[in-house]
Swiss-Prot record:
Keyword annotations from UniProtKB, A to Z: Developmental protein, Disease variant, Disulfide bond, Extracellular matrix, Glycoprotein, Lipoprotein, Phosphoprotein, Secreted, Signal, Wnt signaling pathway
Lipidated positions per record (O-palmitoleoyl serine): S253
Disulfide bridge positions per record: C83-C94, C136-C144, C146-C199, C247-C261, C249-C256, C318-C349, C334-C344, C348-C388, C364-C379, C366-C376, C371-C372
Tissue specificity field: Detected in most adult tissues. Highest levels were found in heart and skeletal muscle. Low levels are found in brain.
Protein's UniProt name: Protein Wnt-10b
Main location: secreted
GO cellular component: extracellular region; extracellular space
Region: Disordered, residue numbers: 171-197
Effect of C256Y: Associated with obesity; abrogates the ability of WNT10B to activate canonical Wnt signaling and blocks adipogenesis
UniProt-listed InterPro entries: Wnt, Wnt10, Wnt_C, Wnt_CS
Name of the gene: WNT10B
Residue positions, PTM Phosphothreonine: T46
Amino acid sequence: MLEEPRPRPPPSGLAGLLFLALCSRALSNEILGLKLPGEPPLTANTVCLTLSGLSKRQLGLCLRNPDVTASALQGLHIAVHECQHQLRDQRWNCSALEGGGRLPHHSAILKRGFRESAFSFSMLAAGVMHAVATACSLGKLVSCGCGWKGSGEQDRLRAKLLQLQALSRGKSFPHSLPSPGPGSSPSPGPQDTWEWGGCNHDMDFGEKFSRDFLDSREAPRDIQARMRIHNNRVGRQVVTENLKRKCKCHGTSGSCQFKTCWRAAPEFRAVGAALRERLGRAIFIDTHNRNSGAFQPRLRPRRLSGELVYFEKSPDFCERDPTMGSPGTRGRACNKTSRLLDGCGSLCCGRGHNVLRQTRVERCHCRFHWCCYVLCDECKVTEWVNVCK
């Protein structure tokens, strides 16, 4: 057995460029690799002008909305982390999305039409939508806030809360409230268990910004561009499909006589799991790229609408190949007792494995904060691991 201390290298790529996660308890903002004290003002200079790889349209969007773009960049970072979690047992495990010190979309695999390319695009689009909508609900962005609610709905909620307050004081329902007009919904009674209220996450704004920021790269008549746009749409659709209802109790002495509820973005782990399931049933498109951008054969739109699509057969990803975005599997930790994809037999592609004693320092107990830093503890781990030759 070999003994080799292998400290974990510092994060690179998007992690290093945007939000280098802290390996100590010290607080720091790192936007695009800039070390800034506290919570700096998010200006075009701190967000846009130091980030390479933006298209002309993206740069313009960033200059107009630097705070929203900062949230979008955090969404990309979270999406890469989730991608790595979902594919942690695969030969291609999303680590290539971190390299290059630029946006993930400059990774070689995102210029191809593999299954893994489709999954990555959907994850990144979902991450941007999710992060922007969440920042809206927290009141962090100038150009958006809570999801829209009609004045009638607000009036119903106000009447309900006033009625509950009056009842808690032993009084009758206040007569000063305006009575509903013809055709209006009746005033809510105290027996009603919940009403829509609170701050809905503005998913429409998050979806639109994700579309404007990511789909702007695409040429509309190119088959690869159409594949990317389609998979971007699927990623955003999964976020919408998994919206959650969150509620807050109202009542005396901690009771829950009445609840106000709002629609909130799902946990991003649930989004990642749903997209991982779609990866397993992704649809192969046999296409003749005649610059028409049409999928051949023409499948029913309903069948395609919620599924990932790809048009290139994936390589085995055993060896390093920068042209395909494959880092290879040499040096990857494997499970020698597993017969699944994470087993040494599969992951090491028949090359065998070594047993090493590794000591590394890694980030742990990380918490994402808006915007744009990650606060982590520092953990030292020593263990025997099986590593692919």
